[in-house]
Design a protein with these regions (language model features):
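Transmembrane helical core of 7TM receptor-like proteins
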Residues: 1-377
Length: 377
């Protein structure tokens, strides 16, 4: 049993969301009173934000389970990115700059899509959700890393560690699913342009995005429960800058075979299914582009897929480097910096790629700037 009596008793007192309720209010106000695009977003936007805000409740349950499991460890020590004091300031400045660009880029992209009627299509709706996922994922890891940079002992409580594990796994699954959904959307747009409105109706878009969010939260919760159901009674030092599932398994002093099998099965299933959807979509897209007689049509189709292909290459390339390298060349320091790229850099690059390389996004931004300039006159 994953849940103990103690954790079940405490369920009724966990009413307030872990994150600030203003996020929910912002989301409701943000998407209210819009016509075309709001019909595509509102049915699930509030529910998604509320589920994300209440994600900490899941981690509180995990925390109560760990307490009832009589773990001797009440906190973990993170070694951080580096122990060199001279490099700490450099890392802090770089991480802070990246996080600010990530927040500005992704939130700005969401606002731009919201206020631009020409971007109120399923493709940009999915892009809006990818921007939200990237901002959420970066916010799960980066702020705590910045706070810990100059601390001598980079300790993190059991509850905060559970929150990070739950949040990071949720983010990883969301990213995989959003990239898969966007690949299918591009397949329909390029291979069946005349049937796009029929094959990508509003109801289907809502179902795909909502199911992605719900599935991601469930996977994050289940994996975190399995992790903190184990007993931690020995070493508590994690050679990482955030609470990661794999190093935590190595610290457990109870049987980890079930957790390891669960991690391998769920992660393998998610990556395999996502990769299959992406590969099949782009195989059909490639055949469709080859059959096009117009050079302009080919260029337009390629530009539609270029940004998404770059995001997929970065994401799966980093995963391959982190988990599929030979043991002989395996290094914890390499894993650490690959994790920086995976959790911090990619969310920033996605917002830049989809804004700077997308002609429609740039045109929408130019129109808004021109409108603001004319209003000042």
């Amino acid at each position: 049993m994953f849940f103990t009596i103690n954790s079940q008793v405490n369920l009724h007192i966990l009413q307030s969301p872990y994150q600030d309720s203003t996020l929910t209010e912002f989301s409701i106000t943000f998407w209210r009173d819009r016509d075309t695009f709001s019909h595509l977003i509102i049915p699930y936007r509030v529910k998604i934000i509320q589920s994300v805000c209440s994600g900490g409740i899941y981690c509180r349950i995990v925390y109560f389970m760990a307490e009832s499991n009589h773990s001797a460890v009440t906190e973990f020590i993170l070694l951080g990115l580096t122990g060199n004091p001279e490099l700490q300031l450099i890392f802090f400045c770089v991480l802070l700059l990246i996080y600010l660009i990530t927040a500005l880029g992704n939130l700005g992209l969401i606002v731009l899509i919201w206020v631009s009627p020409q971007l109120h299509t399923p493709m940009y709706s999915f892009l809006c959700h990818l921007a939200f996922v990237d901002f959420y994922g970066s916010s799960t890891i980066t702020p705590n890393t910045l706070v810990n940079t100059f601390r001598k002992i980079k300790s993190i409580s059991l509850y905060a560690c559970a929150t990070q594990v739950c949040g990071f796994i949720t983010f990883s699954v969301w990213e995989l699913l959003m990239l898969s959904v966007m690949a299918y959307d591009r397949y329909v747009a390029i291979c069946h342009p005349l049937l796009y409105a029929v094959l990508m109706p509003r109801k289907l878009c809502i179902q795909m995005v909502t199911s992605s969010y719900i599935y991601g939260v469930l996977v994050g919760f289940i994996q975190a429960v399995a992790t903190f159901h184990m007993t931690f009674c020995g070493p508590n030092v994690i050679n990482q800058f955030y609470c990661d599932d794999v190093p935590l398994i190595a610290l457990a002093c109870s049987d980890t075979r079930v957790k390891e099998l669960m991690l391998l099965a769920i992660a393998g299933f998610n990556v395999f299914c996502s990769l299959i959807i992406v590969l099949i979509s782009y195989v059909f897209i490639a055949f469709a582009i080859v059959r096009m007689h117009s050079a302009v049509g080919r260029q337009k189709a390629f530009s539609t897929c270029a940004s998404h292909l770059f995001s997929i290459t970065m994401y799966y390339g980093t995963l391959t480097f982190m988990y599929l390298q030979p043991k002989s060349s395996h290094s914890l320091d390499k894993d650490k910096f690959a994790s920086v790229f995976y959790t911090v850099v990619i969310p920033m690059l996605n917002s830049l790629i989809y804004s700077l390389r997308n002609r429609e996004v740039k045109n929408a931004l130019r129109k808004i700037i021109e409108k603001m300039y004319l209003n000042k006159k």
